[in-house]
């Protein structure tokens, strides 16, 4: 496992903003170098002096990312990044993704045996649940057992229907030893980031997915939930004054509805937002703004429902649809050139595990016509409302397909509804936009190409490939870096040959913020989505 992580991290660029500063009624901060990505080694920004003020910022306001992402507990939250982030404000895990590797969190110390099978975690002895009950190793043990019967949203305790944990031993009130069923490179993340729940609450709950007790949002995290409105997607969190770990940077975190994030940012209504490609130059030149690059972190896929449209079970038809799409034009029109045509093997070209040895599907409308015109396909095209760019991309897809004889009807829904329709298979083709493209690929490959239809919003209806499923399933057990690269190369080749889904374009995107207002943003090693990293909400984490 150590070799696997080391290889990935050595090839990835990690951006971390280590100094934390800001302004509120009690103090001021100094901006980082404006118009550029923040310097990972910078410590020039003024940090909050605990003697002068308790928090870097009184209220940190962020966009709600387009809607409701579920209640922030392990059984109610959306598995998209914004949903998981809100849950992780409230419910802590043993470990946390740090800038370079996993770091201690609820566990004060931890170790792994040389054979990668035995994990020992010793908890912070002063950790408390939000109702002031102590957190103990028995809560960790209970969480493992409870999730075995009631899987948490996005949980990874099971691989191919078998638990990754063989057994555990609680050796004292604050120490648990977990024995893995087999050595997997993914065990550290899957075990370490499991949200821990309080035994004294959930042991009396038979149906956690519908439980509505007043204590359903009691965790031991850095923040407590103050309010949540599913109708507007609004959330407010308050700093946990009894928190055992890092110092919360904001007194309150508010997620607010926004119709236009750029306008909201300009008006000072939110502290951070992505910047569209057409506005990048203007904002990068401003002295009061810092930019964070997120290279190929986000991208679009076109999902194909082969059960609803049996003609698409023919790979020649799928290839024709792919060739009908002018993806270079999509990069130019949607991302103003700040992006890439996605690989048919899914893994983007900026990912260290990318393989160029995949089937290429260049734009060829005439070849597509020969296959598609005789079929007379009529497709119901479901899209979301993630970003204004999505409507633009959908229109380009529609135009390209209609130019080769495919009739397309576009239906637009809010993000949660679109995701629900993806899970249930309520579409012919569906456009989805998500992050995680540039992380180590195994998690996304498992979700997209080895999942079960009806259980995940990522999976293709009407497609299965046992060889690919077996290959992806073997990847977590590979610790040799050369063998790992070979396995990823083979998986990408199979995916590009089968093209059960059509990766379209990936985005070289940027987030922007005002360092003088809030400068605590951090990157986790497996993602450049700064707003989704727990460390971004602490004022005392040092890189």
Model-derived regions, located:
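Structural transition elements
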Residues: 8, 340-371, 387-390
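Alpha-helical secondary-structure segments
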Residues: 61, 136-143, 173-177, 222, ...
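N-terminal lobe/hinge region of extracytoplasmic solute-binding protein
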Residues: 61-114, 145, 218
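A structural "hinge/loop" feature
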Residues: 64-85, 106-108, 133, 187-196, ...
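Surface-exposed binding/hinge segments that line
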Residues: 111, 158-204
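Ligand-site clamp/hinge motif
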Residues: 240-283
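Detector for C-terminal structural segments
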Residues: 324-353, 389-398, 423-543
């Amino acid at each position: 496992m150590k070799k696997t992580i080391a290889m990935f991290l050595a090839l990835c660029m990690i951006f971390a903003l280590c100094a934390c500063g800001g302004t509120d009624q009690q103090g001021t901060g100094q901006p980082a170098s404006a118009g550029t990505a923040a310097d990972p080694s910078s410590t020039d920004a003024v940090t909050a002096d605990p003697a002068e003020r308790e928090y870097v910022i009184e209220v940190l306001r962020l966009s709600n990312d387009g809607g409701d992402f579920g209640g922030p507990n392990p059984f109610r939250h959306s598995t998209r990044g914004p949903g998981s982030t809100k849950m992780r404000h409230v419910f802590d895990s043993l470990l946390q993704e740090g800038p370079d590797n996993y770091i201690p969190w609820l566990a004060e110390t931890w170790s792994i045996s040389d054979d990668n099978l035995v994990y020992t975690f010793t908890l912070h002895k002063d950790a408390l649940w939000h109702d002031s009950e102590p957190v103990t190793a028995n809560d960790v043990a209970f969480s493992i057992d409870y999730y075995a019967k009631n899987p948490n949203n996005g949980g990874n305790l099971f691989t191919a229907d078998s638990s990754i944990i063989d057994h555990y031993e609680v050796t004292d009130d604050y120490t648990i030893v977990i024995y893995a069923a087999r050595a997997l490179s993914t065990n550290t993340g899957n075990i370490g980031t499991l949200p821990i729940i309080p035994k004294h609450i959930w042991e009396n709950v038979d149906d956690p997915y519908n439980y509505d007790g007043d204590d359903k949002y009691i965790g031991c995290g850095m923040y407590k939930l103050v309010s949540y409105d599913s109708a507007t997607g609004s959330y407010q969190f308050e700093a946990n004054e009894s928190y055992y770990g890092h110092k919360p940077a904001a007194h309150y975190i508010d997620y607010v509805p926004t119709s236009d994030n750029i306008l909201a940012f300009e008006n000072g209504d939110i502290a951070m937002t992505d910047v569209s490609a057409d506005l990048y130059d203007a904002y990068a030149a401003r002295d009061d703004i810092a930019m964070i690059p997120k290279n190929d972190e986000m991208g679009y896929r076109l999902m194909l429902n082969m059960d609803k449209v049996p003609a698409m079970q023919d790979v020649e038809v799928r290839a024709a649809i792919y060739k009908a799409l002018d993806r270079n034009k999509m990069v130019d029109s949607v991302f103003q050139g700040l992006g890439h045509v996605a690989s048919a093997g899914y893994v983007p070209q900026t990912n260290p595990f990318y393989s160029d040895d995949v089937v290429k599907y260049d734009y060829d409308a005439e070849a597509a016509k020969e296959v598609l015109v005789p079929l007379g396909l009529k497709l119901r095209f479901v899209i979301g409302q993630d970003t204004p760019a999505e409507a633009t991309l959908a229109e380009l897809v529609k135009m390209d397909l209609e130019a080769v004889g495919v009739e397309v009807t576009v239906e637009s829904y809010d993000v949660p509804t679109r995701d629900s329709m993806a899970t249930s298979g309520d579409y012919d083709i569906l456009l989805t936009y998500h992050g995680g493209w540039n992380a180590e690929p195994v998690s996304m490959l498992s979700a997209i190409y080895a999942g079960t239809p009806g259980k995940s919003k990522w999976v293709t209806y009407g497609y299965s490939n046992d060889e690919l499923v077996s290959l992806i399933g073997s990847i977590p057990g590979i610790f040799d870096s050369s063998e790992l690269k070979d396995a990823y190369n083979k998986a990408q080749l199979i995916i590009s040959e089968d093209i059960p889904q059509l990766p379209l374009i990936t985005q070289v995107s940027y987030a922007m913020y005002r360092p003088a207002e809030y400068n605590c943003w951090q990157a986790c090693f497996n993602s450049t989505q700064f707003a989704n990293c727990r460390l971004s909400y602490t004022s005392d984490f040092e890189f």
